[in-house]
Structure formats: structure tokens, C-alpha cells
């Protein structure tokens, strides 16, 4: 784990000079040959942990958008357990911003809002992307009360025909209703959730 590897390292370790190798035309394709032109650059042996992370909580989606390859993945697609998510947060103690997104639809994950709450409770600014097809009233309420800072809604078309030609398996009217519900719920609860399109 990241934490295990870094546990014994001092944050004030000295920087070291390492060779920078240039591409070369030495005829034999050995462009990593140390006898080739090099100079020294200073590199910190213990770079700081990231302040931003993007995590894919789930690797599947309820749509079949024309431009997306999620339904053609050959890797094992599943969902991240809440324990694994908590472990990742533990390994990234300096995290300031977290974006929950990948190829999958984050709101398909049964513990999506729990993940947001876990991260937000640590002072992490959490954002996510969504196709907004899965937003009954109870989920709209969770959206504005769980600590989510920003939600980007993917709407690829201003008309029903264009949208549904791109976002296959989605209903334009349903997404517009869900967006309206989200905005009304946000106003009712005076939520600071940023909603972006």
C-alpha cells in the first residue's frame, strides 16, 4: 500500500541528482545508453502524496452511450467495497479533492452517498459525474445533504432526438425531470452543491 511504502520515509529527505537520458540515434536503438548525452536534474526522493485523486467506484453503467466503451471492457468489472474505499482514503492523508468518476455511472453504486459522506467528513472536497438517470426523490435529497461539493451532469444534446441518439437507453424527459427535482431539492435545503452541465 502507499502508506506502508511511505511509512518509514522521512518527509525531509535530501534531493538527489539523477541522469536524464535523451533520445539518440546511435544506430542500435539503445536510447537508454548512459554513455549518451545526459545532464543532471534534481528529483525529490520522497515526493509529497497527491492532493487530488480520481476514483472509479463502479465499473458498469446503465446506459450504452455511443462514445463510451464501458460495456466493452474486458477487465473484471465490479464495484469498490466501502472498506476498500476507506482504505484508499487512509492511504492518502493529504487528499484535498476527490473526483468520483470512471467509465461507470457512480450513482449505480449502492454506497455512493456513503462514500461521499466518508470523504467529506475528512474535509475532502468531493465531486462526481453522473448521467442523472437514477434520481428518485430520496436520492435527490441525499445528493444535496451528503456533503457532495460538485455534480457534473452529462446531457449531450438540447433536444430529445439528439440526446437519445447519443445516450442510448436514457430518457431525455426523465433526465430533465430529475434535474428539475435536484435543483428544487437543492433550493429547499439551501444546499451549496454546485450543479454543472
Residue ranges and their predicted role:
Residues 72, 170, 183-186:
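A general structural signal marking secondary-structure boundaries and capping sites
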Residues 29-150, 161, 165-166, 173-177:
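Conserved alpha-helical substructure of the radical SAM core
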Residues 1-2, 10, 14-24:
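Short, low-complexity intrinsically disordered segments enriched in A/P/G/S/L with frequent Arg
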Residues 158:
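Flexible loop/hinge segments that line or gate small-molecule binding clefts
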Residues 153-155:
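Conserved phosphate-donor/acceptor-positioning beta-strand/loop module used by diverse small-molecule
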Residues 126, 130, 179-197:
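Conserved strand-turn element in the central/C-terminal portion of the radical SAM core barrel
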Amino acid at each position: 500500500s502507499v502508506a506502508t511504502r511511505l511509512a518509514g520515509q522521512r518527509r525531509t529527505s535530501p534531493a538527489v541528482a539523477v541522469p536524464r537520458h535523451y533520445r539518440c540515434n546511435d544506430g542500435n536503438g539503445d536510447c537508454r545508453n548512459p554513455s549518451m548525452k545526459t545532464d543532471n536534474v534534481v528529483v525529490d526522493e520522497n515526493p509529497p502524496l497527491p492532493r487530488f485523486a480520481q476514483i472509479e467506484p463502479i465499473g458498469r453503467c446503465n446506459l450504452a452511450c455511443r462514445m463510451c466503451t464501458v460495456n466493452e471492457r474486458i477487465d473484471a468489472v465490479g464495484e469498490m467495497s466501502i472498506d476498500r474505499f476507506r482504505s484508499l482514503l487512509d492511504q492518502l492523508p493529504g487528499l484535498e479533492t476527490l473526483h468520483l468518476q470512471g467509465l461507470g455511472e457512480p450513482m449505480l453504486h449502492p454506497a455512493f452517498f456513503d462514500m461521499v459522506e466518508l470523504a467529506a467528513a475528512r474535509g475532502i472536497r468531493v465531486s462526481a459525474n453522473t448521467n442523472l438517470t437514477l434520481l428518485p426523490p430520496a436520492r435527490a435529497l441525499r445528493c444535496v445533504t451528503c456533503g457532495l461539493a460538485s455534480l457534473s451532469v452529462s446531457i449531450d444534446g438540447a433536444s430529445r432526438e439528439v440526446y437519445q441518439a447519443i445516450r442510448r437507453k436514457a430518457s431525455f424527459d426523465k433526465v430533465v425531470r430529475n434535474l428539475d427535482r435536484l435543483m428544487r431539492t437543492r433550493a429547499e435545503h439551501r444546499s451549496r452543491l454546485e450543479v454543472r452541465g
